[in-house]
Amino acid sequence: MTIQKNWQELIRPNKLHVVPGSDPSRFATLIAEPLERGFGQTLGNALRRILLSSLQGAAVQSVHIDGVLHEFSSIAGVREDVTDIVLNIKDISIKMQGEGPKRMVVKKQGPGTVTAGDIQTVGDIVVLNPDLPICTLDDGAEIRMEFTVASGKGYVAAERNRPEDAPIGLIPVDSLYSPVRKVSYKVENTREGQILDYDKLTMMIETNGGVTPEDAVAFAARILQDQLNVFVNFEEPRKEVATEIIPDLAFNPGFLKKVDELELSVRSANCLKNDNIVYIGDLVQKSEAEMLRTPNFGRKSLNEIKEVLAQMGLHLGMEVPGWPPENIDELAKRFEDHY
């Protein structure tokens, strides 16, 4: 037995399916299937921990408020005390280019609410939640705050953000650098061929908008990959790749793809299976009338299949010369490896 069989013969996900949320830059559901049994929990837990703790982001490190000496002060004409203001500042979401530290300032007169959108930023800093309230000013009140922003990862407590030579009046802030706000996942059974107990991993991710959920998972997977490399204590033997002659076909090689790859609804997929329609080449030769004569196959399934085929530049009722070819299963496998 070659060592490569330890990983080459495990089933791997066909692809990552991304379902965007109401705001695709912040919310998404990602689905990976099929996975070997147990791998859904293993990968889901590892990715969740990395997403919440290890991705780089930006956050406020400290704030200086004119006329304020420490966080237990109050400010004339400002309804919130400084402790509450600092808690609100901690929730400011920021996207920053470069390392920092950098400065941003807010100055406002009352009456009214000071929000994160009032902050004056330089071109390489973007406030991602401008509607966040920071404090409320009465008539005649005025406030000026200067923030120090830096990049980092995970969570850093306020005390660790206090420089040794901190001037009087500099108030450190808890920093939540991670651009990922929430991650949850679930593992369900899924089917591949005749095997019913593979894993399906579904991850629900919310970010602050500084990175998309899809990119966040990609970064987390890359971190995990990099950390695991140290455990690989061998080099794979070089595989001699023989030059394979790919035969010329009288039809589109795409017809050799299986209809399972079309991501149809369960009802439509089952109808095709029951009618022994395995390959796209089998499907496109069928007319609409033939399809509607298939048991349990209705107009809704027909429209679904027509739409999917149209996206591929195909349609029902096509003539496919030379279909089905001899040794179709072998041909399908060979073209799967090359296209």
UniProtKB/Swiss-Prot annotation:
Record's keyword annotation contains Nucleotidyltransferase: yes
Output the SMART domains linked to this UniProt entry.
RPOLD
Region annotation Alpha N-terminal domain (alpha-NTD): residue ranges?
Answer: 1-235
Biological process terms in GO annotation: DNA-templated transcription
A single GO CC term, please?
A: cytoplasm
| Entry keyword annotation includes Nucleotidyltransferase | yes
Supply the InterPro entries for this chain: DNA-dir_RNA_pol_insert, DNA-dir_RNA_pol_RpoA/D/Rpb3, DNA-dir_RpoA, RBP11-like, RNAP_asu_C, RNApol_insert_sf
In its UniProt record, a GO molecular function of this protein is: protein dimerization activity
UniProt keywords, alphabetically: DNA-directed RNA polymerase, Nucleotidyltransferase, Transcription, Transferase
Task performed by this protein: DNA-dependent RNA polymerase catalyzes the transcription of DNA into RNA using the four ribonucleoside triphosphates as substrates.
Q: What is known of its domains?
A: The N-terminal domain is essential for RNAP assembly and basal transcription, whereas the C-terminal domain is involved in interaction with transcriptional regulators and with upstream promoter elements.
Subunit structure, per the record? Answer: Homodimer. The RNAP catalytic core consists of 2 alpha, 1 beta, 1 beta' and 1 omega subunit. When a sigma factor is associated with the core the holoenzyme is formed, which can initiate transcription.
| Name assigned to this protein | DNA-directed RNA polymerase subunit alpha
> What organism is recorded for this protein?
Nitrobacter hamburgensis (strain DSM 10229 / NCIMB 13809 / X14)
Q: Kindly list the organism's lineage.
A: Bacteria, Pseudomonadati, Pseudomonadota, Alphaproteobacteria, Hyphomicrobiales
